[in-house]
């Protein structure tokens, strides 16, 4: 789960991380009133969307008067902001964060993530802040530093000293950096975060370190333990089909293709998406119904797939282990009778009760195209939509 910048800063401040502060606006009629509450020489108006690249896309504006700030805020609120992370459709700006500006002497990048390949927690930092870290990694990889923390032993003093040293901090700034490292680590562990990113972490005119922008992504599996964090969820920032799928216990990610996919198991789902591309089409989604899906969940999965107007055909690929093929077949028939399936449908079944499942489908009277293996299924669905 993602949250907005102002929410991320609120969490980080609770853990002792110094951040820039401001006020959030959720209604246009509150813009002028909110800006009047800020007494500052410089105003920073920031669009609040769950995507990076806001600055380059015009979603962050710095102005030097209240009147300018009000005009910029009114112009920005409600626009469709397109960044390199939103895709061409963009994201509507329903919230603004208005801050007091400050002088920036130096910008740094600082984050903490799970490194699955090394089975550890990793700090990533760079003296090149304020830009995409991917760009730094590509052009000047030597400027990226990493420190890995063994979860069994936790954060140690040498980690904090090492990060401060590698970033070039000395004396009081080194002490500040060590405290920030410790605070961010504690926030990461205690909130079940998947990533915390501060970009940029700046040195201001007083020589102090300050988190000027912040992003936190949480592990969905840990949200049950954090109702206060779950309450920060902004459904307007999420695809409504993905929200609907999550409520139904389905793993669904919308994509830009034209072939809807319903599969059991994440690995098989990714293989199915790959082979669709191999045969010349593109997947419209990732959808894993899971191993314990019942008839109603299968039915809801197909409804979600068909709610995407870009879907021109559907490929169902089920390997029945825990999942029974006859349950899948019954769910397909129920969905077809309930909402109608007007696009080509290819079904490949294998595993538990496969013959019973095939029999149910063949006796249904529906126009279902059977496939005997994955390659055959991909070939048939691609040919069917041409």
Curated annotation (Swiss-Prot):
Mg(2+) binds at residues 199, 213. The keyword Transcription does not apply. Pathway: Carbohydrate metabolism; tricarboxylic acid cycle; succinate from succinyl-CoA (ligase route): step 1/1. Belongs to the succinate/malate CoA ligase beta subunit family. Its cofactor is Mg(2+). Gene3D superfamilies: ATP-grasp fold, A domain, ATP-grasp fold, B domain, Succinyl-CoA synthetase domains. SUPFAM superfamilies: Glutathione synthetase ATP-binding domain-like, Succinyl-CoA synthetase domains. One of its GO terms (molecular function) is ATP binding. This is Succinate--CoA ligase [ADP-forming] subunit beta. It catalyses: succinate + ATP + CoA = succinyl-CoA + ADP + phosphate; GTP + succinate + CoA = succinyl-CoA + GDP + phosphate. It comes from the Bacteria. Its EC number is 6.2.1.5.
